[in-house]
Amino acid sequence: TTYDALNDIALLESSVRDDLNSRATRISAVINPVKLIITNYPEGQVEELEAINNPEDPEAGSHLIEFSRELWMEREDFMEDAPKKYFRMTPGQEVRLKNAYIVKCTGCKKDENGVITEVYCEYDANTRSGMPDANRKVKGTLHWVSCNHCLQAEVRLYDRLWKVENPRDELAAIREAKKCEALEAMKEIINPDSLKVLPNCYIEKFAVTLPPLSYLCLLYTSDAADERSSV
């Protein structure tokens, strides 16, 4: 088209999600980790659980993930003093760990600065798939990775390059007002958070078998491709 239109980037993002939902393999990655300890789970025990590769594509198959006493979970998925309609992890409340068991949060541990370093819970052994209470309903489901069966990863989160909706018109206005070059004007509207690098994340080992395809894709580092990945 020759029409000079301005489209919301949210339309592009929505189309990308729709495309990837139909073909991208699902894996778990924890980008802001806090340790979750299942206090009544046997120490040293490891289970292999089935994870569906793509719920929208039955032919995509599945892969195995390890489950153990100590897991990494998202820090954002825990709140010590939660509001009434909070359905993630909080003391006294049950949630399901994706592809695994229902657990009930029993508390947390903090450091000298009040930062939560560990979250504690107890699991119900009868809630794993195939067990008597497997279909018991809870309102929250959380993703996780096993502490001893995952890879450390550097995650790079990309956001919008510009702070304004219409950079072309904004650049013209800045140049007119300040009588400056385009490059100088660009510096005023570039989003400083367009790239966030998170160095201490964790991801399933299965991720290293995947080609660069999904919304989060793998970029192997040259010095330790078998131990560390960049997502």
Predicted regions and their residues:
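Cytosolic catalytic cores of cyclic-nucleotide second-messenger enzymes
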Residues: V231
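N-terminal leader/propeptide and maturation segments of large enzyme subunits in energy/redox metabolism
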Residues: T1-A5
